[in-house]
Amino acid sequence: MLLTERFPLKFRHILTNPIQGYPMECTVQWLGPNGMAFAARTGSGHIAAMDGAPEGGGNNLAPRPMELVLAGTGGCAAYDVVLILKRSRQEVSGCEVRLQAERAESDPKVFTRIHFHFTVRGKGLKADAVKRAIHLSAEKYCSASIMLGKTAEITHGWEIVEA
Protein backbone atom coordinates (compact mmCIF):
# COMPACT_ATOMS: atom_id res chain seq x y z
CA MET A 1 0.00 0.00 0.00
CA LEU A 2 1.34 3.43 -0.92
CA LEU A 3 1.75 6.01 1.81
CA THR A 4 -0.66 8.35 0.05
CA GLU A 5 -3.31 5.60 0.01
CA ARG A 6 -3.24 5.48 3.81
CA PHE A 7 -4.25 9.12 4.23
CA PRO A 8 -7.55 10.85 3.47
CA LEU A 9 -7.73 12.89 0.28
CA LYS A 10 -7.10 16.23 2.00
CA PHE A 11 -3.69 14.99 3.19
CA ARG A 12 -2.79 13.33 -0.10
CA HIS A 13 -2.35 16.72 -1.80
CA ILE A 14 0.09 17.86 0.88
CA LEU A 15 2.15 14.67 0.59
CA THR A 16 2.41 14.76 -3.20
CA ASN A 17 2.56 18.55 -3.67
CA PRO A 18 4.49 20.20 -0.83
CA ILE A 19 3.50 23.70 0.13
CA GLN A 20 5.92 26.22 -1.36
CA GLY A 21 7.55 29.01 0.57
CA TYR A 22 8.85 27.32 3.71
CA PRO A 23 12.32 28.75 4.42
CA MET A 24 13.64 25.57 6.05
CA GLU A 25 13.32 21.97 4.98
CA CYS A 26 14.57 18.51 5.82
CA THR A 27 13.97 15.08 4.29
CA VAL A 28 14.15 12.05 6.58
CA GLN A 29 14.52 8.59 5.05
CA TRP A 30 14.26 5.20 6.73
CA LEU A 31 17.40 3.22 5.88
CA GLY A 32 15.89 -0.20 5.63
CA PRO A 33 13.98 -3.13 6.97
CA ASN A 34 16.67 -4.39 9.38
CA GLY A 35 16.34 -1.74 12.03
CA MET A 36 15.15 1.73 12.85
CA ALA A 37 17.93 3.86 11.39
CA PHE A 38 17.09 7.06 9.52
CA ALA A 39 19.08 9.64 7.59
CA ALA A 40 18.04 13.28 7.53
CA ARG A 41 19.18 15.52 4.68
CA THR A 42 18.86 19.17 5.57
CA GLY A 43 18.02 22.00 3.22
CA SER A 44 21.63 23.17 3.53
CA GLY A 45 22.80 19.80 2.18
CA HIS A 46 24.06 18.14 5.36
CA ILE A 47 23.21 14.64 6.52
CA ALA A 48 22.50 13.53 10.09
CA ALA A 49 21.97 9.92 11.11
CA MET A 50 19.49 8.72 13.73
CA ASP A 51 18.77 5.29 15.17
CA GLY A 52 16.63 3.74 17.82
CA ALA A 53 17.51 1.79 20.92
CA PRO A 54 17.74 -2.00 20.55
CA GLU A 55 14.63 -2.44 22.69
CA GLY A 56 12.76 -0.32 20.12
CA GLY A 57 14.05 -2.22 17.10
CA GLY A 58 17.12 -0.07 16.49
CA ASN A 59 20.77 -1.03 16.38
CA ASN A 60 22.21 1.84 18.45
CA LEU A 61 24.27 3.08 15.49
CA ALA A 62 23.51 6.78 15.87
CA PRO A 63 21.88 9.26 18.26
CA ARG A 64 18.18 8.95 19.03
CA PRO A 65 15.99 11.60 17.40
CA MET A 66 15.23 13.25 20.75
CA GLU A 67 18.95 13.33 21.57
CA LEU A 68 19.40 15.34 18.39
CA VAL A 69 16.61 17.70 19.47
CA LEU A 70 18.51 18.23 22.73
CA ALA A 71 21.85 18.59 20.92
CA GLY A 72 20.36 21.06 18.47
CA THR A 73 19.02 23.10 21.35
CA GLY A 74 22.44 23.14 22.97
CA GLY A 75 24.03 24.15 19.67
CA CYS A 76 21.51 26.95 19.23
CA ALA A 77 22.13 28.30 22.74
CA ALA A 78 25.93 27.99 22.55
CA TYR A 79 25.94 29.74 19.17
CA ASP A 80 23.99 32.64 20.65
CA VAL A 81 26.21 32.91 23.73
CA VAL A 82 29.43 32.96 21.70
CA LEU A 83 28.04 35.47 19.21
CA ILE A 84 26.75 37.79 21.95
CA LEU A 85 30.07 37.62 23.83
CA LYS A 86 32.05 38.36 20.66
CA ARG A 87 29.81 41.32 19.86
CA SER A 88 30.33 42.53 23.43
CA ARG A 89 34.08 42.54 22.72
CA GLN A 90 34.76 39.73 25.18
CA GLU A 91 37.82 37.57 24.46
CA VAL A 92 35.96 34.26 24.37
CA SER A 93 38.06 31.28 23.27
CA GLY A 94 35.76 28.38 24.10
CA CYS A 95 32.22 27.51 25.02
CA GLU A 96 30.76 24.19 26.06
CA VAL A 97 27.21 23.56 27.17
CA ARG A 98 26.22 20.37 28.95
CA LEU A 99 22.52 19.60 28.82
CA GLN A 100 20.65 17.25 31.12
CA ALA A 101 17.01 16.51 30.46
CA GLU A 102 14.05 14.58 31.80
CA ARG A 103 11.12 13.43 29.71
CA ALA A 104 7.53 12.62 30.57
CA GLU A 105 6.91 8.97 31.41
CA SER A 106 3.95 8.60 29.06
CA ASP A 107 3.61 9.38 25.37
CA PRO A 108 4.35 11.75 23.76
CA LYS A 109 7.25 11.83 26.27
CA VAL A 110 8.02 15.51 25.85
CA PHE A 111 10.91 17.09 27.69
CA THR A 112 9.72 18.21 31.13
CA ARG A 113 12.99 19.56 32.58
CA ILE A 114 16.19 20.70 30.90
CA HIS A 115 19.27 22.10 32.59
CA PHE A 116 21.96 23.93 30.60
CA HIS A 117 25.41 24.28 32.16
CA PHE A 118 27.75 26.56 30.23
CA THR A 119 31.52 26.48 30.61
CA VAL A 120 32.86 29.58 28.92
CA ARG A 121 36.60 30.03 28.39
CA GLY A 122 38.39 33.23 27.65
CA LYS A 123 40.77 35.92 28.72
CA GLY A 124 39.38 38.34 31.30
CA LEU A 125 35.74 37.45 30.65
CA LYS A 126 33.31 39.54 32.67
CA ALA A 127 30.79 37.53 34.68
CA ASP A 128 28.05 40.06 33.91
CA ALA A 129 28.69 39.68 30.17
CA VAL A 130 28.45 35.87 30.35
CA LYS A 131 25.29 36.03 32.46
CA ARG A 132 23.76 38.56 30.03
CA ALA A 133 24.63 36.42 26.98
CA ILE A 134 23.01 33.33 28.50
CA HIS A 135 19.94 35.34 29.51
CA LEU A 136 19.53 36.86 26.04
CA SER A 137 19.89 33.46 24.41
CA ALA A 138 17.31 31.91 26.75
CA GLU A 139 14.78 34.73 26.61
CA LYS A 140 15.14 36.25 23.15
CA TYR A 141 17.29 34.47 20.57
CA CYS A 142 17.41 30.66 20.95
CA SER A 143 14.26 29.56 19.18
CA ALA A 144 14.91 25.91 20.06
CA SER A 145 15.09 26.44 23.82
CA ILE A 146 12.20 28.91 23.74
CA MET A 147 10.04 26.28 21.98
CA LEU A 148 11.08 23.56 24.42
CA GLY A 149 10.35 25.94 27.27
CA LYS A 150 6.66 25.61 26.38
CA THR A 151 6.67 22.09 27.86
CA ALA A 152 9.83 21.96 29.97
CA GLU A 153 11.15 23.79 32.99
CA ILE A 154 14.47 25.19 31.80
CA THR A 155 17.30 26.18 34.13
CA HIS A 156 20.80 27.50 33.49
CA GLY A 157 24.13 27.38 35.23
CA TRP A 158 27.50 28.65 34.13
CA GLU A 159 31.16 28.97 34.97
CA ILE A 160 34.06 30.92 33.54
CA VAL A 161 37.46 29.34 32.96
CA GLU A 162 40.35 31.75 32.48
CA ALA A 163 42.27 30.86 29.33
What is each residue range found by the language model?
Residues 73-76:
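Alpha-helical metal-binding/catalytic segments enriched in His/Glu/Asp
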Residues 3, 7, 11-71, 82-163:
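Extended beta-strand/beta-hairpin segments
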Residues 78-80:
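Ribosome-associated translation termination/rescue signal centered on the conserved GGQ peptidyl-tRNA hydrolysis loop
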